[in-house]
Curated annotation (Swiss-Prot):
Pfam families: Lactamase_B_2. May be involved in the transport of PQQ or its precursor to the periplasm. Keywords: PQQ biosynthesis, Transport. The keyword Glycosyltransferase does not apply. It comes from Pseudomonas putida (strain W619). This is Coenzyme PQQ synthesis protein B. GO terms for biological process: pyrroloquinoline quinone biosynthetic process. Belongs to the PqqB family.
């Protein structure tokens, strides 16, 4: 299985266009040793030719331009994208679909709850129906596994995550299973397994068991501290309120990942306020000391 990190930042990217927190300001004035990042999205393939896009970032055009296999140039109009999987209906995971309209129709896999959001509060399915068939919906059931024909050697097992629907959603304050998903992706030839959960607010025994069975854990790296947004003066909500488990402290993501010495561990969906973006920070050193990697745009993983 080929895993390509197209974007590794949380919503807004890094540096965020309107932010002057220590990280964003430091990156712009050159006082911070850090790497710019686009908003999170990954691509998966079983042959390096046919790719499944997981979430469609607002930065999708730049991400595809930076990854040559996404333009195989076999025809006058071409793309390496053969299917799209949406883990939720958040704006920073779906807006990129608008930029892919010239390539419609697209096969899109998502839950019923995500499809409801994308036909009501943010009606992308309706809007894009005017472009050559638009988005062709394939239902993700919450029980069992599924295979996408373009990559027949990859088996996807979805699992619901506890998190809120987007602010625009008609059921924002009435959460349902299927609003947010993680994925366990297995290459049935090699046996390699990826646990992918860019929005992970709580880890229960069922998830721990799935993580133990995986070879690579690509998980939520949004915040270092639960009250980071408040400390930095850029927000009022905690990480847990937003559905993100912070890295630091008792019960934090790093403590969870300490229990997986065999697995490759990678943090993704990193917010612009997170001090691990500063490559010289003690927080970054602590992450590395504990055997955890920080995802970056263009990172490649094979399982």
């Amino acid at each position: 299985m080929y895993i390509q990190i197209l974007g590794s930042a949380a919503g807004g990217g890094f540096p965020q266009w309107n932010c002057n927190c220590a990280n964003c300001k430091g990156y712009r004035d050159g006082s911070l040793r850090a790497t710019a990042r686009t908003q999170s999205s990954i691509a998966l393939s079983d042959d390096g030719v046919h790719w499944i896009l997981c979430n469609a970032s607002p930065d999708i055009r730049a991400q595809l331009q930076a990854f040559a296999p996404m333009q195989p140039a076999r025809a006058l109009r071409d793309t390496g994208i053969n299917a799209i999987v949406l883990l939720d209906s958040q704006i920073d995971h779906t807006t990129g679909l608008l930029s892919l309209r010239e390539g419609c129709p697209h096969q899109v896999w998502c839950t019923d709850m995500v499809h409801q959001d994308l036909t009501t509060g943010f009606p992308l399915f309706n809007m894009l129906s005017h472009w050559n068939g638009g988005l062709q919906w394939n239902l993700i059931e919450l029980e069992g596994s599924f295979v996408i024909p373009a990559c027949p050697n990859l088996r996807f097992t979805p699992f619901p995550l506890r998190s809120a629907a987007p602010p625009y959603s008609p059921h924002r304050f009435d959460p349902h299973p299927g609003d947010n998903l993680g994925l366990l992706v297995e290459d049935i030839r090699t046996g390699g397994k990826l646990f992918y959960a860019p929005g992970l607010g709580q880890v229960d025994d069922k998830l721990l068991a799935m993580m133990h069975g995986a070879d690579c854990l690509l998980v939520d790296g949004t915040l270092w501290e639960d009250d980071e947004m408040q400390r930095r003066g850029v927000g009022t909500r905690t990480g847990r309120e937003m559905g993100h488990l912070a890295q630091n402290g008792p019960g934090g993501m790093l403590e969870v990942l300490d229990g997986f010495p065999r697995q490759r561990k990678v943090l993704i969906h990193i917010n612009n306020t997170n001090p691990i973006l500063d490559e010289d920070s003690p927080e970054r050193a602590e992450v590395q000391r504990r055997g955890v990697e920080v995802a970056f745009d263009g990172m490649s993983i094979e399982l």
